[in-house]
A protein has these predicted regions:
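Non-catalytic signal-transmission and effector/linker regions of two-component phosphorelay proteins
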Residues: 1-12, 117-130
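Conserved acidic carboxylate
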Residues: 15
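Acidic, metal-coordinating helix/loop segments flanking the phosphotransfer/catalytic sites
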Residues: 38-56
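Receiver (REC) domain active-site loop signature in two-component systems and cognate sites
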Residues: 63
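A Lys-centered signature of the CheY-like receiver
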Residues: 112
């Protein structure tokens, strides 16, 4: 395994929809070979991030309570901030929305619905472009 592959093996995915979480788990773990922790809310991600120590955070944009952008801001405001890349997953893909995600610090956006067979490849490509 190369250093690059090791660098991004742990993904924290935040998604409120249990069906999408289940498909994403298959895509990330079984197809992609990542170690993944899936959280149902931004609040849960805040509780788990230090214990899990992800190499990348994958965030749904539209969630009840704390949405994806609010979750990212909360993660950034923690003691020590957020030192790993963030990718948003969303169906909200207007140019102004994508610009907002990038201004918040995301390295990219993966459109929903996503293809479980290519999700890991999309993530690796975004990381490689950084």
């Amino acid at each position: 395994m190369t250093a690059s592959a090791r660098q991004f093996e742990r993904i924290l995915y935040v998604e409120d929809d249990p069906d999408i979480r289940a498909v994403a788990e298959l895509a990330l773990v079984d197809v992609g070979g990542f170690v993944a922790l899936l959280c149902e809310s931004g609040q849960r991600a805040l509780e788990e991030i230090d214990r899990f120590q992800p190499d990348l955070v994958l965030l749904d944009v539209m969630m009840p309570g704390m949405d994806g952008p609010e979750t990212l801001q909360a993660l950034q405001q923690r003691a020590g901030g957020l030192s790993v890349p963030v990718v948003f997953m969303t169906a909200r893909l207007q140019p102004s929305e994508i610009q907002e995600y990038e201004e918040l610090g995301a390295i990219g956006v993966i459109p929903k619905p996503f293809d479980p067979m290519t999700l890991a490849e999309q993530i690796r490509r975004l990381v490689a472009e950084q």
